[in-house]
Swiss-Prot record:
Pathway: Carbohydrate biosynthesis; 3-deoxy-D-manno-octulosonate biosynthesis; 3-deoxy-D-manno-octulosonate from D-ribulose 5-phosphate: step 2/3; Bacterial outer membrane biogenesis; lipopolysaccharide biosynthesis. It comes from Methylococcus capsulatus (strain ATCC 33009 / NCIMB 11132 / Bath). Keywords: Cytoplasm, Lipopolysaccharide biosynthesis, Transferase. The gene is kdsA. This is 2-dehydro-3-deoxyphosphooctonate aldolase. The keyword Methyltransferase does not apply. It is found in: Cytoplasm. InterPro entries: Aldolase_TIM, DAHP1/KDSA, KDO8P_synthase. It is an enzyme of class 2 (transferase).
Length: 283
């Protein structure tokens, strides 16, 4: 493992430049697609906030949460209905969209609708899966497994980059710390730059308590601002956050989702911090 601060390959993502020389971008939305109206309302509110702050924005939501704690938990509307709703978000709100895919997902069908594909953390070691997703040619956000050392993400990124797809990002979402708990090692954000890919920090899954409620995961959303500030202070290209108008009633990951009505205040702070950090060379 090197101590060298490696700059990511700059590239255009959904029409805006990404990298440490460019402003922080945001990937945000509810964990899972609940209703079309909720998706449109949330995307519209986030677009208004980010437009006002000059933050590039990608809307995210899942049509199938395949790794829920319980088989009885809500997984989403399914691919056909989920893609229809995401297409409506693109059409009506005018923002790019991201969703996660799985080993049995018809990748080309999803890629025909969404702008960015995301690979789940639990699947980061699956070589065929990672390369099949990258082979769609779409930008890919590679989630780091909760079990994986940050320096091992270079192997995951290399698998994706070997396909010829240069639009690859790596995402930190916390590391297992005993049972039912995650912590964020901020050193990983610097280490993961050695992949040569833009680094994204997932500020909401990082406060998740996996399986902490028995048949569902818990979370400590009160720590989202502290961890998000720390990550931006280290220097990142993008921030990933799950948000919901009423997190306590969200159908998935409510305990670690940030309230939509508090997004503007947090993003104002983070945007200011990002400009300060990127005004000088990283040490």
């Amino acid at each position: 493992m090197s101590n060298v601060e490696t700059s990511a390959r700059p590239f255009e993502l959904c029409g805006f430049p990404v990298g440490l020389e460019h402003p922080l971008f945001l990937i945000a939305g509810p964990c899972v697609i609940e209703t079309e109206q909720l998706a449109l309302d949330t995307a519209g509110a986030l677009k208004e906030i980010t437009d006002g702050l000059g933050i590039p924005f990608i809307y995210k939501s899942s049509f199938d949460k395949a790794n829920r704690s319980s088989h009885a938990s809500y997984r989403g509307p399914g691919m056909e209905e989920g893609l229809r709703i995401l297409a409506e978000v693109k059409r009506q709100i005018g923002v790019p969209v991201l969703t996660d895919v799985h080993e049995d997902t018809p990748l080309q069908e999803v890629a025909s609708v969404v702008d960015v594909l995301q690979t789940p953390a639990f699947l980061c070691r699956q070589t065929n899966f990672i390369q099949n997703v990258a082979n769609t040619g779409k930008p890919v956000n590679l989630k780091k497994g909760q079990f994986l050392a940050p320096w091992d993400m270079k192997h995951v990124a290399a698998k994706a980059l070997a396909t010829g797809n240069r639009h690859i990002m790596v995402c930190e979402r916390g590391v297992s710390f005993g049972y039912n708990n995650l912590v964020s090692d901020m050193r990983s954000l610097s280490i993961m730059r050695e992949t040569g890919c833009p680094v994204v920090y997932d500020a909401t899954h990082s406060v998740q308590l996996p399986g902490g409620q028995g048949t569902a995961s818990g979370g400590q959303r009160e720590f989202v601002p502290a961890l998000a500030r720390a990550a931006v202070a280290v220097g990142i290209s993008g921030l990933f956050m799950e948000t919901h108008p009423d997190p306590d009633r969200a159908l998935s990951d409510g305990p670690n989702s940030w309230p939509l009505d508090r997004m503007k205040a947090l993003l104002e702070l983070l945007s200011t911090l990002d400009r300060t950090v990127k005004a000088s060379p990283l040490l």
